C-alpha cells in the first residue's frame, strides 16, 4: 500500500502536503481502501476557517459515511470541485487527483504533531 514519504499524515488517515505555507489535504490509500467505492464527497466552502480537529466534510462510500477532519488550523484557500462530479477519483488516485482542500496554515507548529510516512505505515500495520 502506498504511503508517499514526502507527505505528513494524521491519525485520522488524512495526508498533508506542505508547499509555501499551504497544506494540500486528502485521504490516504489505506482510508479509501477501508471505505470501499466512494460515491459522494462533501467539501466545505473556500474561505472557511478551520481549527485543527474540526470536521470539514465527509466521504460517502457504499459501506459507510466517514467524516473528514482538519489536520491543521487555517483558512481554506481552494477546494477540489472535481470530486463533486467524480468522487471515484478518491479510489483511483488518492494522492494526486483526489486532493480535497488546500489550507493556508495559521499555526505551523501543528505540523510537528503530524506523523511521518514511517510512523503512519507503522500505525496501519504496513
From Swiss-Prot:
CDD domains: GCS_H. PROSITE patterns: BIOTINYL_LIPOYL, LIPOYL. InterPro entries: 2-oxoA_DH_lipoyl-BS (IPR003016), Biotin_lipoyl (IPR000089), GCV_H (IPR002930), GCV_H/Fam206 (IPR033753), GCV_H_sub (IPR017453), Single_hybrid_motif (IPR011053). GO terms for biological process: glycine decarboxylation via glycine cleavage system. The modification N6-lipoyllysine is found at residue 63. It comes from the Bacteria. One of its GO terms (cellular component) is cytosol. The keyword Cell membrane does not apply. It holds the Pfam family GCV_H. Keywords: Lipoyl. Its cofactor is (R)-lipoate. Binds 1 lipoyl cofactor covalently. SUPFAM superfamilies: Single hybrid motif. Belongs to the GcvH family. The glycine cleavage system is composed of four proteins: P, T, L and H. This is Glycine cleavage system H protein. It comes from Staphylococcus epidermidis (strain ATCC 12228 / FDA PCI 1200). The gene is gcvH.
